[in-house]
Each structure stands twice: as C-alpha cells, then as structure tokens.
C-alpha cells in the first residue's frame, strides 16, 4: 500500500517556510542588491522535499515499507508535470509570437525540460545560471525541478532496499550521511574558484546532498511521531532559541551570501542545508513558536501556491524585463510582475494542479474536454476549417521564426594581430573577401585583415560626424605610446576591436564571448612575448563574473614588465561592484597598472549599450576606445 494518508500530519508552518523560500528566489531573480543570496531558497526547497517525500514513504512505526512504485510515480507525475508542461507550452507560444529572438534558446531548453533533464542540458551547453546575457532562457528555473524528479525516480528504490538491508532507521541515516559528505566533497572538488560555478550548481551529483539531508532528517525525526505538545519549559526555550537562530542565519545568508564566494561551494551550501534541516525539525514540532508565526494565512497561501509561483515567476521576469533595467528595478514594474505571477499561479493551482492531483488525468480530462467535444460536433464546417487554417498558419509562422532564430549574429571568438596582417600584404583582394566570409560563418577561425582599408573607412565615416571631434581625433591618430599592444577581453572586447585596430598600428586583439578571468590566466602563457617594458597590455574582463584577488594578481604578474591598462566594467549584475573594487585596488597597488574608468562614463550614457545592457553600440565602442587611448597617452 501507499502510505500517503496514514498518520500524515499537515504542518502549516512548513507552508510558511515554503513562502520564505520562494520569496527569496524571486527577490534574487529580480536582482535586488539586498537579496544577493536569495538563491538559497532552492536549498531550502531541496531539504524540505527530501524530508517530506521520505516522511510520506515511511510507515508511522516499524521498518517495513510496502510501497507500490507505480502508484508513487503516478502521484508524482500528477503533482509536478501538468503545471510544468502548461508553463513550458505557454512560454514557447509567447516566444514564438512575441519574442522570436529567444527561439534558438528556448527550443532545446523546452525539450530537455519536458524530460526533466534540463540541468544536464544546461551543463553540457555551458549555460550559466548566474551570467547569461542577450538570450536568457525563460525556462532556466526548471533545472531544480529536473533534479527533484531525477531524485524521485531513484530515491524510493534506494529507501526500500536500504531499509531491507540495514533493518534500522538510525543505521540507514548514518549511511545517508556518508552519501551527503560524498556529494558535498564532489561539489568542493569540481568547483573552480573564480570560474563560473554553474557546473556544480546545476549538477544532480553535486546538489543531491541537500535532498539527502532532508531524507536523513525524516529517518531520525519523523513528523508522524511528533504529536506531543507537552515539553518541559527548559526544552521548549531551547527549541524556540534554536529555531530563531536557524531562521536568522538563513535570513543573513539571503542578504550576505555571494554566488561567487568559494566558501559557498566548499562547505557553505552544506552549512546552509544543515541549518535549513534544523529549522524544519523545529517547525515540525507542535511546540514551535516560529511554526505558529509561519502559519500566518498570507504565508500559507503563498506556500500552497509556491510550486506554481516558482514555475511562473522566472518566465514572467525574463520576458517582461528590459535588460537595461536589471540591477535598477522599477518599483511598479516589480509590483506588476509579482501580481501577474500570483494570478498565473492561482489559476494553475485551482484549474490544473489541484483537480489533476485529486481526480487524476482521466477524470480531469472527462470533466474538462468531453463537453467541449460535444460543442465541437455542433460547430459548422466553415468554422472548423477556419480554426484549422489558423492553427496551420501559426505552425508555419513558428517554423519560419525558428529558422530565423537559429542564425548566429555575432562571432563567439576572434583573434586579430596586426603583425600577421602586415605579413600578408601580398594577399589578393578576392582572398580577403573569402577570409571575411569565412570569419562570418566560422566564428572560431583565427582571422587576419587589412588594417589600412578599415582605417580609411573609419576616417571617411568620421568626417560626417563633427560633433564627435575629440573622440574622432583620438581614434584617427594611432596612439603609439608602446611598440606593441596586446588586448585581452570578452565580448565587450569584440565590440571595440575594429576601433582598436584603427587606433593602434601594432595591436594584437584576443576576445571571446563569455571569457572568465580563469581562462585568461591560461591564455597569458601564449603571449609571454608581451611581458616587456616597451609593450602595453589592455585587459577587459569582469563582464561574465567575479574573480578572486589572487587570480587578477596572477594575471598581472604574467605581464609584470609591461604597462597594463585595466578596463573596469559596467554590467547589470551583482558582481559589478566587487569586480570594479578589485580592479581599482590592483591599479593602486602596482606602478605599472593604470585603471581605465569605463564604469563612470557608461553610467551616464545608457544609450551606449544594446538592449541587453552589456554589449556596445558603435557610439559606445568609440567612447570606450577613446578612453583607452586617452589613458595610454597620459
């Protein structure tokens, strides 16, 4: 038999805890500066899910689990799939009709989400949870549901076999504790400081310890036995102090935790999960004072709808937020997004989740669709043909848009060396055209151009814009303050590459979309020849994430004899201030390092940026290049 209803307690305080978790996640995704650690709401959800699912599977007394696996999995499917599939379908339709630029992103994400494998899809396609620009996936939040569903497939079998072998809940809890440590150690080992932590953040292997902590708690602290409301006053005071301390720790983590802090992945998440487990244990006790506070009706309402709220909030935010607004939220926009999310979650709860969970798919489909079919039979032939034509037209339209969305607009990596250009002066003009075409269709190819032709085009174009005299003069005349210049950067470096070529007669440019500081450390070995007093190195990094002080110091040490120009960043993400602070400290600490203050200039001119708030339009690229030239001349 399936032990779902036997001795099962409803604990309203857990709904309040769900509300706290989902609100933390929403504030994080809304990019509030005071909720940098709001993503820990997912940690709370994982621990709570492990606790509840194990409590449901375990009998109230004894160690024999008589479980109907098929019945369990069908119930999980009823609980999770309908609302998720509705959200996926609605999001795809919205993107097809109104936001076709996202189609190339959503297409694969939607398919992987249907099979609850999106977390591994994101890992294999290197989609960062923290720093994707230009085409953010509105389905990215489904990674956590994928982990839970994968866990629900494996855990019941493990629990039944484990109880059969161990014959004791305490011994099985000890085994699970070892698995917790293995998963946490794996997260620590796979994590690379200063790099993008998305691999360990998305991975089922590196996040399962949070679910397992909840499972172990259910074995040693079963909610079905916590029925006594009588505690000695001393123990009651201890309970109240413990739950208050645990809750305060989680609140402080929401405020202070940073997704790029190495501590988070080397014991920090384990600490947060254990704290969440302690809080859950306290709230489940009938004598819990905090449990009563969390039972406040509005919090319970949020908690019972937390699944739908979690599903809908992210696509609502992504599809309705201009990226230039990220980090600078508009109050009434936020209110509107929250209202829309709650309305969608309420509709999903009442018309999809609850009916299917209680009635099953067949009863629900009969109730909803049979009378619609009867109405369809009475519809005229002309009306039926019209509806069919509209559906067909939408499908054709969507297919056409999918083709457009699949085209890549910008190169992902580009390397330029003026030395190679000078060496290839005998190349025919037809070969140059072929090389340009190859560059367009193969962004990973290393390309060489003629610097002279581009410079002439630039000069002729600048003559028509006399309002930009200062910048134009700086760009027209090469700034030969160093015999050779090396420029290393990310996608912003790609944006300014053509202007750098026109400003420096002897420049090597190496830019790549998504480049992190950790990747630049490896790249520096290829450019050892630039570590000389008569050479200059421009470093433009920090767009894609935070880096440690040791990493930037190591990169600067690679070019300790050259003069280095650090370009600070303007990026609508939480790590912006930390990156710029670190760059400023390095500029003050090293005599051969100069800071190029792009951030101050960019803040005053939002028109310098494309709609993603990160990459540059031509005017912005000219301005940034002019700042670099000015810094090198001074």
Curated annotation (Swiss-Prot):
Its EC number is 2.3.1.-. One of its GO terms (cellular component) is plasma membrane. Residues 414-429 have a biased composition (Polar residues). It is an enzyme of class 2 (transferase). It is found in: Cell membrane. The gene is yrhL. The keyword Membrane applies. InterPro entries: Acyl_transf_3_dom, Acyltransferase_3, SGNH_hydro_sf. This is Putative peptidoglycan O-acetyltransferase YrhL. Its main location: membrane. SUPFAM superfamilies: SGNH hydrolase (SSF52266). Belongs to the acyltransferase 3 family. One of its GO terms (molecular function) is acyltransferase activity, transferring groups other than amino-acyl groups. Residues 413-481 are annotated as: Disordered.
């Amino acid at each position: 038999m399936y032990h779902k209803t036997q001795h099962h307690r409803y604990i309203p305080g857990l709904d309040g805890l769900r509300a706290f978790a989902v609100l933390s996640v929403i504030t994080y995704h809304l990019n509030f500066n005071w909720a940098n650690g709001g993503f820990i709401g997912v940690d709370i959800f994982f621990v709570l899910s492990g606790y509840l699912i194990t409590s449901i599977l375990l009998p109230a007394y004894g160690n024999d689990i008589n479980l109907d696996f098929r019945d369990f999995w069908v119930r999980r499917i009823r609980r999770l799939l309908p609302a998720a599939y509705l959200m996926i379908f609605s999001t795809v339709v919205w993107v097809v009709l109104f936001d076709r630029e996202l189609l190339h992103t959503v297409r694969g994400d939607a398919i992987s989400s249907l099979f609850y494998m999106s977390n591994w899809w994101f890992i294999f396609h290197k989609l960062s949870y923290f720093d994707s620009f230009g085409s953010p996936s509105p389905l990215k939040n489904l990674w956590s549901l994928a982990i839970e569903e994968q866990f629900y497939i494996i855990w019941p079998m493990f629990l039944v076999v484990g109880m059969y072998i161990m014959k004791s809940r305490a011994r099985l809890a000890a085994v699970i504790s070892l698995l917790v440590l293995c998963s946490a150690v794996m997260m620590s080992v796979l994590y690379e400081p200063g790099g993008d932590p998305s691999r360990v953040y998305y991975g089922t292997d590196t996040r399962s310890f949070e679910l397992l902590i909840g499972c172990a708690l259910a074995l040693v602290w079963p909610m079905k036995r916590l029925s006594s409301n009588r505690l000695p006053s001393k123990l009651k005071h201890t309970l109240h102090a413990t739950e208050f301390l645990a809750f305060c720790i989680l609140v402080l983590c929401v405020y202070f935790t940073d997704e790029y802090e190495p501590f988070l992945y080397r014991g920090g998440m384990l600490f947060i999960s254990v704290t969440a487990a302690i809080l859950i244990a306290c709230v489940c006790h009938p004598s819990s004072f905090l449990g009563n506070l969390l039972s406040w009706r509005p919090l319970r309402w949020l908690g019972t709808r937390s699944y739908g709220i979690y599903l809908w909030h992210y696509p609502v935010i992504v599809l309705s937020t201009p990226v230039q607004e990220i980090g600078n939220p508009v109050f009434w926009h936020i209110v509107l997004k929250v209202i829309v999310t709650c309305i969608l979650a309420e509709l999903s709860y009442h018309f999809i989740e609850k009916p299917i969970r209680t009635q099953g798919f067949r009863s629900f489909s009969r109730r909803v669709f049979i009378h619609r079919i009867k109405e369809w039979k009475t519809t005229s032939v002309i009306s039926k043909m019209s509806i069919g034509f509209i559906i067909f037209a939408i499908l054709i339209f969507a297919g056409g848009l999918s083709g457009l969305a699949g085209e890549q607009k910008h190169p992902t990596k580009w390397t330029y060396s003026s030395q190679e250009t000078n060496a290839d002066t005998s190349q025919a003009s037809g070969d140059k055209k072929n090389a340009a075409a190859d560059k367009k269709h193969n962004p990973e190819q290393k390309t060489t151009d003629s610097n002279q032709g581009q410079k002439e085009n630039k000069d002729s174009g600048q003559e028509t814009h006399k309002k930009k005299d200062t910048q134009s003069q700086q760009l027209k005349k090469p700034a030969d303050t160093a015999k050779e210049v090396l420029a290393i950067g990310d996608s912003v470096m790609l944006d300014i590459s053509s202007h750098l070529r026109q400003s420096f007669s002897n420049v090597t440019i190496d830019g790549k979309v998504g480049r992190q500081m950790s990747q630049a450390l490896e790249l520096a070995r290829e450019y050892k020849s630039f570590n000389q007093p008569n050479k200059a190195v421009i470093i433009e990094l920090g767009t894609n994430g935070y880096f440690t002080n040791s990493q930037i110091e190591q990169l600067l040490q690679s070019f300790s004899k050259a003069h280095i120009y650090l370009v600070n960043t303007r990026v609508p993400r939480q790590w912006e201030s930390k990156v710029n602070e670190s760059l400023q400290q390095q500029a003050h600490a090293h005599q051969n390092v100069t800071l190029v203050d792009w951030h101050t200039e960019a803040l005053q001119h939002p028109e310098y940026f494309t709609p993603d708030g990160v990459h540059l339009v031509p005017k912005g690229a000219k301005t940034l290049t002019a700042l670099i030239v000015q810094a090198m001349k001074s």
